[in-house]
């Protein structure tokens, strides 16, 4: 699925992902490829993104985005936001 993470300051990430774990109002939830359409509010917490392929150039990432040793998992701390998934495209507006 295509993921776009946007903050008021910048576009933090845009790319193809396998799964995204999000801090929802009622706890953590995960969105996988081909998930049903959804709109949800987010609370303060950490977003975990499982990439479909390792990142080749991590130097261009915003400093809020952390990458694991395999370059296949991103984590981003957020203060809240909103997420919408339609047609296998996930748009995340984060604070």
State where each predicted segment sits.
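Compact, glycine-rich, soluble single-domain proteins
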Residues: 2-95
């Amino acid at each position: 699925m295509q993921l776009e993470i946007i903050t008021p300051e910048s576009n933090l990430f845009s790319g193809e992902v396998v799964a995204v774990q999000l801090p929802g109002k009622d706890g953590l939830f995960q969105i996988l490829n081909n998930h049903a359409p959804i709109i949800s509010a987010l609370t303060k917490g950490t977003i975990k993104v499982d990439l479909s392929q390792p990142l080749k150039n991590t130097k261009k990432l915003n400093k809020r985005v952390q990458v694991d040793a395999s370059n296949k998992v991103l984590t981003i701390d957020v203060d809240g936001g909103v997420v919408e998934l339609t047609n296998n495209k996930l748009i995340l507006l984060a604070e």
